[in-house]
């Protein structure tokens, strides 16, 4: 597992090593588009998973764009989460049909290290491919946040990546 320079900020890494590590992480993440499906009643789980990566991406000189459906990000929450307040940009009350198009345009520009958008429906293969291509062009990361109700998850089985931890073995 890669440990970021941010996590080791108290260490005495030379600046060039630190910058090389950040560049390696940026290049490895280029073109990454991931969907985060979470329970509506447990949004903290998604935050716990994403915050370390968002903090690391916040070290870049580029913006972080949040395309939120209705809620406005709290200034206090952004600061307490360790995200760079001066690099977080938000567009709220965006209609779901415009979120995908906005994400593609934002990812493609290269102005954002990460673009986070909320979707209510699953993406088609074509939509996902468009996001991945835009993220590669802009050397950016995209996160699709998709809240689901607890009873909706129990009705069907999802295939996906299982992350094993030696904490439980």
From Swiss-Prot:
Q: Which Gene3D superfamilies match?
A: P-loop containing nucleotide triphosphate hydrolases (3.40.50.300)
> InterPro entries attached here?
Cell_div_suppressor_SulA (IPR004596), P-loop_NTPase (IPR027417), SulA_CellDiv_inhibitor (IPR050356), SulA_enterobact (IPR047696)
Recorded source organism is: Salmonella gallinarum (strain 287/91 / NCTC 13346)
Family the entry assigns: Belongs to the SulA family.
Its protein name is: Cell division inhibitor SulA
State the UniProt keywords alphabetically: Cell cycle, Cell division, DNA damage, Septation, SOS response
Q: What induces it?
A: By DNA damage, as part of the SOS response.
Q: Which gene encodes it?
A: sulA
Its quaternary structure? Interacts with FtsZ.
**Origin: domain of life:** Bacteria
The region called Lon protease binding is annotated at 162-169
Q: Which PANTHER family match?
A: BLR3025 PROTEIN-RELATED (PTHR35369), CELL DIVISION INHIBITOR SULA (PTHR35369:SF4)
Q: How is it modified after translation?
A: Is rapidly cleaved and degraded by the Lon protease once DNA damage is repaired.
Q: List the disulfide bonds.
A: none
Pfam families, alphabetically?
SulA (PF03846)
Q: Which GO terms describe its biological process?
A: division septum assembly; DNA repair; negative regulation of cell division; SOS response
Q: What is the lineage of its organism?
A: Bacteria, Pseudomonadati, Pseudomonadota, Gammaproteobacteria, Enterobacterales
Function description? Component of the SOS system and an inhibitor of cell division. Accumulation of SulA causes rapid cessation of cell division and the appearance of long, non-septate filaments. In the presence of GTP, binds a polymerization-competent form of FtsZ in a 1:1 ratio, thus inhibiting FtsZ polymerization and therefore preventing it from participating in the assembly of the Z ring. This mechanism prevents the premature segregation of damaged DNA to daughter cells during cell division.
Q: Site positions for Essential for degradation by Lon protease, renumbered to this chain?
A: 169
Region entry FtsZ binding: which residue ranges?
106-112
- Entry's HAMAP family? SulA
């Amino acid at each position: 597992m890669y440990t970021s320079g941010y996590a080791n900020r108290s260490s005495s890494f030379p600046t060039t090593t630190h910058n090389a590590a950040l560049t390696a992480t940026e290049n490895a993440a280029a073109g990454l588009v991931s969907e985060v499906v979470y329970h509506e009643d447990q949004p903290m789980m998604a935050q716990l998973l994403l915050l370390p990566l968002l903090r690391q991406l916040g070290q870049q000189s580029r913006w972080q764009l949040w395309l939120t459906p209705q809620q406005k990000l709290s200034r206090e929450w952004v600061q307490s989460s360790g995200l760079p307040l001066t690099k977080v940009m938000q567009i709220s009350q965006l209609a779901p049909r415009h979120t995908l198009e906005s994400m593609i345009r934002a990812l493609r520009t290269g102005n954002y290290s990460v673009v986070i958008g909320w979707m209510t429906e699953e993406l088609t293969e074509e939509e996902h491919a468009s996001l991945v291509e835009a993220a590669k062009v802009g050397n950016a990361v995209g996160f699709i946040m998709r809240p689901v109700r607890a009873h909706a998850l129990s009705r069907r089985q999802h295939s996906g990546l299982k992350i094993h931890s030696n904490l439980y073995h």
